[in-house]
Swiss-Prot record:
Catalytic reactions on record: 4 porphobilinogen + H2O = hydroxymethylbilane + 4 NH4(+)
Any one GO MF annotation of this record: hydroxymethylbilane synthase activity
Positions of post-translational S-(dipyrrolylmethanemethyl)cysteine modification: C243
Keyword Transferase in annotation: yes
Name of the protein described by the UniProt record: Porphobilinogen deaminase
Source organism of this protein record: Aliivibrio salmonicida (strain LFI1238)
Annotated GO biological process: protoporphyrinogen IX biosynthetic process
Note: The porphobilinogen subunits are added to the dipyrromethane group.
InterPro entries: HemC, Porphobilin_deaminase_cofac_BS, Porphobilin_deaminase_N, Porphobilinogen_deaminase_C, Porphobilinogen_deaminase_C_sf
Keyword Transferase appears in the UniProt entry: yes
Amino acid sequence: MSQQLPVRIATRKSPLALWQAHFVKDALQAAHPGLEVELVTMVTKGDIILDTPLAKIGGKGLFVKELEVAMLEGRADLAVHSMKDVPVEFPEGLGLVTICERGDPRDAFVSNTYNNIDELPQGATVGTCSLRRQCQLKEYRPDLIIKELRGNVGTRLQKLDDGNYDAIILACAGLIRLGLEDRIKSSIEPEQSLPAVGQGAVGIETRLNDDRIRALLAPLNHPETAHRVLCERAMNNRLEGGCQVPIGSYSLIDGDQIWLRALVGEPDGSIMVRGETTGPVSDAEELGTKLAEQLLNDGAKDILDRLYADA
């Protein structure tokens, strides 16, 4: 009988969160024909507090706490996350067990008037809620005015359309998944702006002692994506980076080798600490940790200490 119990997915109500939940539901049912899967929708603190910068209210962990409580209380079996939004640490008993194949990891330049960052006039206003995007934009174009931008994807696009910004920066993956790729004027290559840790990947969190759910999820794991994301997260973990710190990273796998590039920056773009490393895929997490140590020694510690002191 236990095999016939429905699998319950905890999800926020935003269009992108629902897309991710349905994506995992469809993948589970494709892997296990006849499996019943239900969505359990809920509102998180991050969905309610929209008038305060994320960095001031605890970062993007605000978007997952309610989902985690539902799993711990047995009201849901798993939660689906954009990996760029997943906190470094999990509550006791929960963990990340599956990482699905990565989508487009790049940032998207979105504007109704301009085609790319270079076309923006002096002093143009760009919307983003990400310190990572802000520091890289300000390094490249110190003249730009960065303005806070909160809300789901549709809300952010509407604020652009209302004339509040000359351009906004979003994640390519989110726009593509919502069928809004026509809003992308240009994709920003990692060489110009490093993405967030895990950007473009979808991860699944569940109870670590739930063998049935873990077995059902196993076919959804994409090993190459998992190695890349775990490498990036190991770097972020050593830096003690939450979701609202100016940390960027990007990894690639070629054969049995993994390459990782990362940065930590002052929010105003005045100081940028960069590094890269390569090594065996089997050492992915160790490589991420070692690169973080290098960044800390090269000045990232001072940047992060100042940020955390101001938080």
